[in-house]
Regions:
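Residues at the loop-to-beta-strand transition
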Residues: 127, 136, 143, 151, ...
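Consensus positions within tandem repeat domains that build extended binding/scaffold surfaces
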Residues: 127, 151, 171, 188, ...
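Short linear S-[DN]-x-LW-Φ motif typified by the pepsin-like aspartic protease active-site region
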Residues: 35-89
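Secretory targeting and sorting signals
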Residues: 1-35
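Acidic, glycine-rich low-complexity repeat segments characteristic
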Residues: 73-119, 216, 261, 267-284
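Glycine-centered beta-turn/loop sites at beta-strand termini
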Residues: 123, 132, 147, 156, ...
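Right-handed parallel beta-helix
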Residues: 93-156, 174
Length: 284
């Protein structure tokens, strides 16, 4: 399996090698009458600096997550609004006691040399949807979102995003904002990295990656991928397979790598390298 994208110093200082965390498996006896429907869980760790949200097996999540600084700016409050019941653990509460599909959890900031995940979301084996908004205007403590198997959709927003989103297996659609990282995983994924200064990797499968403002690092990995740079100085990697790369405007670097690739530089002073294979290389 291909390597996932990594953060770079100073903003992306922490190298991420994130695996999908084990999902909670509820204990139930087949055929037991009146068995309780398993719920998602939200709980801050005992050191108060990281919130973990876990879906139950078999759930379809449609979650909206908002991150905002506490009044004294010493921590972050995450409000998670889903369509499934959530069990509120340590440092989490229901804003409306009658609605157990929405929780608010507060984590305390820590003094760390490197960026760290203040929120870890592990969704499960269905077609899930997550909308994440970072309203903290910082990305040192970021969100790490694993969508799990299934055809999932994630959308990140905010002046600064900074989230790390992993699609895992399935045909996923990932949209990340400024400073966001994305990894499609196995499947035919679509990754929109238009916020600026993004790192995105498609993973195994025939993927489509699109850049936007500022510089992007976009890699297709295994499969026949199509990659579009944006308006900045982008670096595009095709990976294994017959790939098509479009630099568009800006001084771009395009690397087809192995396979019969097509590289189109677009306006700007571009560097084009087809790699092994029967390649088509065109510079405007």
């Amino acid at each position: 399996m291909s390597a996932r994208p990594h953060r770079r110093r100073p903003v992306r200082a922490l190298a991420l090698a994130v695996g999908t965390a084990a999902l909670a498996v509820p204990f139930a006896l087949t055929g037991t009458a009146g068995a309780a429907t398993p719920s998602a869980t939200a709980e801050v760790n005992r050191y108060d600096w990281q919130l973990t949200y876990k879906a139950a097996v078999g759930q379809t999540n449609k979650a909206t997550v908002t991150a905002s600084l506490t009044g004294d700016r010493s921590g972050i409050t995450y409000v998670i609004d889903d369509v499934v019941t959530i069990t509120a653990g340590h440092d989490c509460a229901y804003p409306n006691s009658a609605d157990h599909t929405k929780v608010a959890c507060t984590v305390t900031g820590v003094d760390s040399q490197d960026p760290y995940a203040a929120l870890v979301m592990n969704l499960g084996d269905r077609n899930d949807t997550v909308a994440y908004k970072n309203a903290t205007d910082q990305i040192y403590s970021y969100a790490e979102i694993s969508l799990g198997t299934g055809d999932d959709k994630a959308t990140d927003s905010g002046r600064l995003d900074g989230a790390y989103v992993s699609g895992d297996a399935g045909d996923d659609t990932l949209t990340v904002g400024a400073e966001g990282l994305a990894w499609g995983g196995d499947g035919k994924d679509t990754i929109n990295a238009g916020g600026g200064d993004n790192i995105a990797k498609g993973g195994r499968g025939d993927d489509v990656l699109r850049g936007g403002a500022a510089g992007q690092d976009l890699a297709g990995d295994d499969g026949n991928d199509t990659i579009y740079g944006g308006t900045g100085a982008d670096t595009l990697y095709g990976g294994k397979g017959n790939d098509v790369l479009y630099g568009n405007s800006g001084n771009d670097r395009l690397y087809g790598n192995s396979g019969n690739d097509k590289l189109y530089g677009g306006p700007g002073r571009d560097t084009l390298s087809g790699g092994p294979g029967r390649n088509v290389v065109h510079q405007d």
